[in-house]
Structure formats: structure tokens, C-alpha cells
Amino acid sequence: MSVFYFTIFYKLHKILETLTGGIILYKLIKYIKMKRENILTGSPWEDKMGYCRAVRIGNIIEVSGTVAIVDGDKVKADDAHAQTLNILERVEKVLEDLNASMKDVIRTRIFTTDVSTFEAVATAHATFFKDIKPTTGFYGINQLVAPEYLVEIELTAVLAE
């Protein structure tokens, strides 16, 4: 961090310290020290596109849009339920690699090319989240990266501090 930015942070801290009793400096130092951890899965698209499966910074985890794949092969092009289960199984593994679990998920975003699959997708989603109940969005979209994909899921997890 440059001296310029540190000076600004320090001056801001002094002003806020007066108002908050010193809590701001602790939080600012904690924020500055947070490291970024990327999870790569070996997909050729990670380098081609410049992304990773998940990123953890501090206690926040963001998981990229995930589609149904088993050993590099697409899963059941006509079965949104099976695709959703596969996606959530893959995401669960990614969370475990980051010392997290599905219980830490606070939000899922489900994208589908066919909103008539809502019940099938919802049933599969409930298999993992019935007792956790993260906030969830279900979005009908025009298409995903391949016509076989019916479902793509992104999620956010937050670990307790």
C-alpha cells in the first residue's frame, strides 16, 4: 500500500476514532490484512477466460456460475433436477476446499433456460438447503454457454467470525 493511501487511511481513522472509540482502526487493519484465496478446478476455461471456481477473502466466499459436469462430460441434458444435484455436489466440494460447508451459504442465484423446470430445480435445491434456507433467486434466461445446460448456479457463503 502506498504511503499516500496509508496517510489518508490514518487521517480518516483519527477522525473516526474520535467518533467510535477506536473500533475503526481494528476493522481497517483486519481488512487490509485479508488475503485472497482462489480455488481452481483444472478446467481449461479458468485460464482461457481468466476466472476461478471460487474466491475467498476473509470470511466471504463467492462461487462462480457452475454447470453440471462429471469428469469433463455434461450431465443429462434433459434433466434439470439431476443437473441441479450435480452442481450443488460440485459446489459443496469447493466449499469444503475452503474450510466451509453448505451451512455457510447465505445466497444462491439459479439461472435456467426453462422456467418450467422450477419445481424440479427447487426440489433438488431443497435437498441441500431445506434446513439452511439461504436467500435465493430463480432467473429465466435466454441461454447458457451450451444448449445442454438447463441450470447454472452461483452462490455466496459467509463464515462466522
Language-model regions, residue ranges each:
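Short, Lys/Arg-enriched N-terminal segments with co-localized hydrophobic residues
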Residues: 14-33
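Short, polar/acidic, helix-capping and beta-turn segments at strand->helix junctions
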Residues: 34-161
